Swiss-Prot record:
CDD domains: SNARE_syntaxin5
Protein name per the record: Putative syntaxin-5
Membrane topology: Single-pass type IV membrane protein
UniProt cross-references to SMART domains, sorted A to Z: t_SNARE
Organism: Caenorhabditis elegans
Residue intervals on the Extracellular side: 413
GO molecular function annotation: SNAP receptor activity; SNARE binding
Length: 413
């Protein structure tokens, strides 16, 4: 082991060459040694050389051992050529890369598909024995597609209802909504029917989600619950906006009625006799009538005046009745909307309470997880302390062995 062939030393030397080589005798039996070495000293020196050798030196020694074994197997005629080829190959492997990278390892393969199928079959039989009936995949996909389509349709109808609500709010915020009263009533009835239909559809979606959640307990059920809660909250916001729009419309109608009452009370004076401002015109008309009839007396047709006054009174009464009827219809619509909003908010409250229970369970689980993490941290700290103590013990044992080895080598050689 002390005679290595062409050992490449990485020690810097003052000469021009970067590496120093040691010649190796390929036939050590025929070499004449000038000095005899004791067997014990030779063994100790060999052991010291092995411990002091680097990884490259050990690799080169393994190369030489491989070359020597190859030489004994081949004939004497091609020994030099084969030796040079092997040495060049091994040197190229040792210099240009890891030799293991150039080795192609082929592992035996075996088809275990039948074993996998048998395992799956046994699992299905075990589940059937326990009373667990797995839901077919196509049924799960169809239910998921149905839920997504229903939720998508509800969301689209909600957006359309919001657009109608904005238009209704524009009509209701106008100061004089007498001309748009028919449009406001029409849009109010449409929005009310839309809110009622959306509430029913969301109820169906909630029942569908509860039915699906009973069959599975995973993240998909939680996602379904969140979708239902989101749609219900959007519908509640739409209902709240509808209620505010109806209140604005009612206030506008009340202001319009007050304004009409003010003007009607101001116009009640000319119903009987003409006012002083128009006295000259009336007097001129009477004079013209006198001149036409050729009479010096003044005659007033009291029957015509009473008929005109009764007609005006009937018209005002009819308009008042129409306004009262419209207002009663509006109030009935508002009351119905408020009752429907109460139902919607009650459903939303139930959903929020369910989510609150889920959040409470999540909070408790988080607390348990934090407690487990603290316990795991304490265990890891304890394990680290044990490892550090064992490491120090290993260092002490290794130091004692090294001291014993050095003393043994120095004093016994």
């Amino acid at each position: 082991m002390s005679d290595f062939h062409n050992i490449r030393s990485r020690r810097r030397i003052p000469e021009a060459s970067s590496y120093s080589t040691v010649d190796f005798d390929y036939d050590p039996d025929q070499k004449n040694h000038t000095s005899a070495v004791a067997p014990t000293s030779f063994a100790y020196s060999s052991l010291t050389t092995v411990f002091n050798a680097s990884a490259s030196q050990l690799w080169n020694s393994a190369q030489e051992a491989l070359v020597s074994s190859y030489d004994t197997a081949e004939g004497t005629e091609s020994i030099d050529a084969d030796r040079s080829k092997v040495v060049e190959t091994l040197e190229s492997l040792s210099i240009f890369g890891n030799p293991l990278d150039h080795i192609i390892i082929t592992m035996p393969s075996r088809d275990r598909t039948s074993e996998f199928r048998a395992t799956a079959k046994s699992y299905e039989m075990k589940a059937a024995a326990n009373g667990i009936r797995p839901q077919p995949k196509h049924e799960m996909l169809s239910e998921s597609v149905q839920f997504n389509q229903l939720a998508k349709r509800i969301g689209k109808e909600l957006s359309q209802t919001c657009a109608k609500m904005e238009k209704l709010a524009e009509y209701a915020k106008k100061k004089s909504c007498y001309e748009e009263r028919s449009q406001i009533d029409h849009l109010s009835s449409i929005v009310k029917s839309d809110i009622t239909g959306l509430n029913k559809q969301i109820g169906q979606l909630q029942e569908f989600s509860k039915r699906r959640a009973g069959n599975m307990k995973n993240q998909n059920s939680g996602h379904i619950q969140l979708v239902v809660v989101g749609l219900q909250s959007k519908l509640a916001n739409v209902g709240k906006d509808y209620q505010s729009v109806l209140e604005i419309s009612t206030e506008t109608m009340k202001a319009e009625k007050n304004r009409r009452d003010k003007f009607s009370s101001g116009a009640a004076v000319p119903m009987g006799l003409p006012s002083s401002s128009s006295g000259a015109n009336v007097r001129s008309k009477l004079l013209q009538d006198d001149e036409q009839h050729g009479s010096s007396s003044i005659a007033l047709d009291m029957g015509a005046l009473s008929n005109m006054q009764s007609q005006q009174t009937m018209q005002q009464r009819d308009s008042s009745l129409e306004y009262a009827q419209a207002r009663s219809n509006t109030m009935a619509t508002i009351e119905g909307s408020i009752s429907e909003l109460g139902q919607i908010f009650s459903q939303l409250a139930s959903l929020v309470s369910e989510q609150g229970e889920m959040i409470t369970r999540i909070d408790s689980n988080v607390e348990d997880t934090a407690l487990n993490i603290d316990m795991a941290h304490s265990e890891l700290v304890r394990y680290l302390q044990n490892i550090s103590k064992n490491r120090w013990l290993m260092i002490q044992v290794f130091g004692v062995l090294m001291v014993f080895f050095v003393v043994f080598v120095l004093f016994l050689t």
